[in-house]
Amino acid sequence: MSDPLIKRALVSVSDKTGIVDFCRELSSLGVEIFSTGGTLKALQDSGVKAASISLITGFPEIMDGRVKTLHPKIHGGLLAVRDNADHVAQAVENGIGFIDMVVVNLYPFEATVARPGVSFEDAIENIDIGGPSMLRSAAKNNESVTVLTDSADYPCVLAEMRSSGGRTTRATRLRLARQVFQLTSRYDGAIARYLTGAEGAAPAAAETMTVKLERELDMRYGENPHQSAGFYTLTDGEGTRSFGDYFEKLHGKELSYNNMLDIAAASGLVEEFRGEEPSVVIIKHTNPCGVAQAPTLVEAWHNAFATDTQAPFGGIIAFNRPLDMVTAEAVNGIFTEILIAPSYEEGVLDLLMKKKDRRLLVQKQALPKGGWEFKSTPFGMLVQERDSKIVAREDLNVVTKRQPTEEELGDLMFAWKICKHIKSNTILYVKNRRTFGVGAGQMSRVDSSKIARWKASEVNLDLHGSVVASDAFFPFADGLLAAAEAGVTAVIQPGGSIRDNEVIEAADANNLAMVFTGMRHFKH
C-alpha cells in the first residue's frame, strides 16, 4: 500500500505548544481540520480554519466534555483498513469518512497528581478517556494514519508532508505509533499507581518487583577503562523504555557509559523548561555548570556559558528549541562531547558534523515523568519514586516580612527547577533567569555556598540582586547570612530545620524575602 494522502486531521490537545502554527501549516497543505473544546477555540481565535468534531459525529460534547470523541464515526474513520473492500463498503454505508491524522496529547494526569495537596476529585477529572482511545485506534492503523503526541514531532512531520505532496513515510508512522503505546502504557501505569496510593498503600513496599533488562547498546567500557559495561532497555510495570525511544544519534563516536549518565542529566534538566522561553543547559560530570533562559537561543547560550567559562569544555549541551545556525556557530567555538536538541535547522548539521567525534543527538519525545528509579548496591537494589513532584508558585510559603517581587519570584522558580538536578549539598545563585554561581556536591552547605560565590567572582558576575536556592534547609543562619553578604535579595529553600525561626529572623534583619517549598531535593 502506498503512503496515503493526509486529507483530514483530528486535533485535540491539552498542551497547546506549537499547535496553532502546526495546524496553520496543515491547512495550507490542504488538510481539513476537526477539533474539540479548548483546542478548537484556540485555533479559531488564531484564524486557523477548523471545524467542530460534532460535524463528524452529529452529536454534541456532553457531560462537561467527558464524552466527545467516543463515537463510531471517529473510531471507524481511524480503524478502517483502506485497502479492505468490506471496510470501505461499511464506511460508505454508515457515512464514515476516513481520518488520516490524529494530533492528541493527554490530560496532564501525572503533573496534576504531582502537585502537593491535589484532591482526589481533581485527579480523577484529569484521567483522559477519549484521548488514549483515539491514540490507540490511530496507532493500531499506522499503515494509514499518522498520529502525533508530542510537539517536538511537528517539524519533521511537516517537512515530510511538504516534500512528499502531503504524505508521511511508513517509517515515520511506525515510529510515532510506537510512541503512542509507550505513552498510554506509562499513562495507565501512573493512574494505577495513584489509585493504589489513594487507598493508603505504599507501592514501593511491594514484596516483589519484576524487571526485565535487554542489552540495547554495547559500550567499550564503564566509568573507567577497567570496568565492562552495557546499556539495557528496561521493562517493568510501567512498560518498556529504551534509549532509542527517546533519542536518535545523528553523528559522532559511539556513546560511552559516562556519556549516557550525562545525557540523562542534561535531558532531565532541559525537560524542566519544555514549552518555555529558549533555554540552554550545560552539563559536566552530571552537574549543571550553566543554565539560562532568554528571548533567543543564542542569548541563552552566551548567558549559560558565562556562568563558568572553563567547565563547558568537553561538556554536554542541551537545548529546548531547534538548534539554529547563529547558536550553532557560537557553540561550535568550543569543544563539546554531545549536543542535544529537539531538531536542527537547515545547514546546522553540515557545520557541526565537521567535528567528527562530537555526538549530535535529537531528543524525539518528552522523557517520562514519575515512575521508579533503581540504584544497585553490592547487597541489593534500592527502589524509589523519581524526584518529579512539582512546586508551583501557589505552593510557596512566604515566611519573611517582605514578600518577593514578581521578578524575584521568577528567578526563585527558575532556580528551584535547577536546584534538584545538582548533587547535594547544593547552593545556587540565579539572576535574570541565568545561573550566576553553582556550589555542588560538598559535605558542608557553607562550603557549597563559598564555592558558588567564588565561581561567580572568577567570571566577574555580580551577585547583588540575585536570588539563592538551597536543596535542603539551612541548619544555621550562617549560610543565609553569607548569601546576604554576597548581595542576595531573596531565598528559596525547603524549610524544616529546628532553627527555622533563627534563619527567618536573619532574613528579616537583612530585608530578604524568603520562601519555603516544603520539599527537599537531596541528590546523591
From Swiss-Prot:
The keyword Plastid does not apply. GO terms for cellular component: cytosol. SMART domains: AICARFT_IMPCHas, MGS. Signal peptide: none annotated. InterPro entries: AICAR_Tfase_dup_dom_sf, Cytidine_deaminase-like, MGS-like_dom, MGS-like_dom_sf, PurH-like. CDD domains: IMPCH. Pathway: Purine metabolism; IMP biosynthesis via de novo pathway; 5-formamido-1-(5-phospho-D-ribosyl)imidazole-4-carboxamide from 5-amino-1-(5-phospho-D-ribosyl)imidazole-4-carboxamide (10-formyl THF route): step 1/1; Purine metabolism; IMP biosynthesis via de novo pathway; IMP from 5-formamido-1-(5-phospho-D-ribosyl)imidazole-4-carboxamide: step 1/1. Its EC number is 2.1.2.3, 3.5.4.10. Residues 1-149 form the MGS-like domain. It catalyses: (6R)-10-formyltetrahydrofolate + 5-amino-1-(5-phospho-beta-D-ribosyl)imidazole-4-carboxamide = 5-formamido-1-(5-phospho-D-ribosyl)imidazole-4-carboxamide + (6S)-5,6,7,8-tetrahydrofolate; IMP + H2O = 5-formamido-1-(5-phospho-D-ribosyl)imidazole-4-carboxamide. HAMAP family: PurH (MF_00139). PANTHER family: BIFUNCTIONAL PURINE BIOSYNTHESIS PROTEIN ATIC (PTHR11692:SF0), BIFUNCTIONAL PURINE BIOSYNTHESIS PROTEIN PURH (PTHR11692). The IMP cyclohydrolase activity resides in the N-terminal region. NCBIfam families: PRK00881.1, purH. This is Bifunctional purine biosynthesis protein PurH. The lineage of its organism: Bacteria, Pseudomonadati, Chlorobiota, Chlorobiia, Chlorobiales. The gene is purH.
